[in-house]
């Protein structure tokens, strides 16, 4: 007999072991971003959000991608189950709205809330671009303002943005104070990520010139969808280590049938009650996921002065 996550969190509350940030620590607002699709962005976003919730943090996952893969993994059929009013869309287009509270919904993971997306959110790309062309550049701060309106309730906000450099992605960059970039070790993905970084630098310079400074507490790269049986991937992994240095998460997120099988069930590996392949494959997959997510967790905690002494005691500072 085991305990539910809600019961574990109750016990953490009784024993004073909740890992929450202090009230004067900044909320970690983390974007999992790459301008190329198919790199494992949504998979990493959802598994990271659930991992943090399992650890006892208060987490908000914001699905900013109109493809709504993250929302789908929480059991929604986005264009049937969700209206445009359930997403970011009203907040991005209606200046009179001052809070994102209306769009937040609890999930079956205790401590993890979701702002979902559906295809209708894509319409806001055109509307934001048109308004910005008329000189309303401050619209890029709308998402930042919305997150600020609810951030007091959370330790971490994880954002899953669209895989494109549009108005929503720029808004995510403005809102985020940390960035995680998933990079599969293939020639196409590696080269497109290099282009993404160059474009990111150029975009941030333009924003700075317009008085919109964007500061990141950390930038990490995750080798995603890794198949080390392929010699070219092994070579590219070595190259990534040389180029990204300590910014590269040490644990690669290897390709696994457990992730694929969980996704086919509209679930994550953390939700599966048992292996869908074999026990050893499941354990290896969880080792990769926990390894990636635990490194990012340390980066998040390093943002919080209240965790300094604990990180030193744990040998993580």
Which positions does each model-derived feature cover?
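P-loop NTP-binding core
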Residues: 2-317
């Amino acid at each position: 007999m085991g305990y539910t996550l809600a019961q574990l969190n109750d016990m953490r509350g009784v024993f004073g072991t909740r890992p929450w940030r202090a009230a004067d620590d900044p909320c970690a607002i983390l974007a999992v971003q790459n301008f190329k699709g198919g790199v494992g962005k949504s998979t990493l976003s959802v598994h990271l959000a659930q991992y943090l919730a399992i650890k006892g943090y208060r987490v908000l996952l914001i699905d900013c991608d109109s493809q709504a893969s993250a929302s789908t993994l929480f059991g929604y059929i986005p264009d049937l189950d969700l209206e445009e009013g359930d997403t970011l869309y009203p907040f991005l287009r209606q200046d009179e709205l001052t809070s994102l509270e209306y769009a937040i919904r609890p999930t079956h993971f205790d401590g993890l809330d979701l702002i979902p997306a559906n295809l209708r959110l894509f319409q806001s790309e055109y509307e934001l671009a048109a308004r910005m062309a008329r000189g309303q550049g401050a619209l890029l701060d709308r998402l930042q303002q919305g997150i600020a309106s609810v951030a007091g309730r959370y330790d971490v906000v994880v954002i899953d943005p669209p895989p494109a450099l549009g108005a929503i992605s720029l808004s995510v960059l403005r809102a985020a104070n940390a960035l995680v970039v998933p990079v599969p070790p293939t020639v196409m993905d590696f080269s497109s990520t290099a282009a993404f970084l160059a474009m990111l630098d150029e975009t941030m310079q333009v924003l700075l010139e317009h008085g919109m400074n964007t500061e990141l507490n950390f930038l990490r790269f995750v080798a995603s969808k890794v198949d080390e049986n392929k010699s070219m991937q092994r070579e590219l992994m070595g190259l990534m280590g040389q180029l990204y240095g300590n910014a590269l998460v040490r644990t690669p997120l290897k390709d696994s049938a457990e992730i694929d099988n969980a996704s086919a069930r509209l679930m994550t590996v953390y939700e599966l009650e048992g292996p869908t392949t074999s026990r050893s494959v499941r354990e290896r997959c969880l080792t990769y996921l926990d390894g990636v997510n635990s490194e990012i967790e340390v980066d998040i905690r390093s943002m919080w002065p209240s965790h300094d002494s604990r990180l030193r005691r744990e040998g993580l500072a």
